[in-house]
């Protein structure tokens, strides 16, 4: 997650790096995200981004902007699947972070979108974070003024 509107020290990648190092891990967390990016945008840069040497793990956090734009969940799933394949071809482990669509998009859209992440985790034997924004979503103190 790019951390749009957050000070740098509160970006997910920075907090993750700080926490892992404080636990004694010798690790570097690199933020490869782009604010506003969709799964298609992520797919466009995946080969290049994942060509860096010594990448052991990727946390895949794409799909939320697809949902906000009403992109067909089948397209989102296909793009995420291609990103996973690129990572796997490079022997990069993948953790996939899920998102949840609101009911305002309709129950069919919500059902189809919400299943993307667990389906891909099962197919590719990935570790799944069911809802990345658990404990953050719908809490005004953790969101932008527009509620996002």
Where are these regions (language model features)?
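Serine-esterase "nucleophile elbow" of acetyl-processing enzymes
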Residues: 1-37, 45-54
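Alpha-helical cap/lid subdomain in secreted, periplasmic
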Residues: 15-18, 22, 41-148
């Amino acid at each position: 997650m790019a951390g749009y509107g957050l000070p740098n020290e509160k970006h997910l990648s920075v907090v993750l790096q700080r926490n892992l190092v404080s636990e004694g891990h010798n690790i570097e967390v690199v933020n490869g995200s782009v604010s506003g990016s969709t799964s298609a945008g992520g797919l466009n840069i995946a080969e290049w981004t994942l060509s860096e040497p010594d990448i052991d793990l990727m946390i895949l956090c794409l799909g939320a902007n697809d949902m906000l734009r009403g992109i067909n969940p089948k397209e989102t799933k296909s793009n995420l699947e291609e990103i996973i394949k690129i990572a796997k071809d490079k022997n990069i482990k993948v953790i996939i972070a899920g998102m949840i669509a609101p009911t305002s998009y309709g129950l069919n859209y919500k059902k189809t979108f919400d299943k993307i992440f667990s389906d891909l985790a099962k197919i590719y034997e990935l570790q799944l974070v069911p809802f990345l924004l658990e404990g953050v979503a719908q809490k005004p103190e953790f969101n932008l003024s527009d509620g996002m």
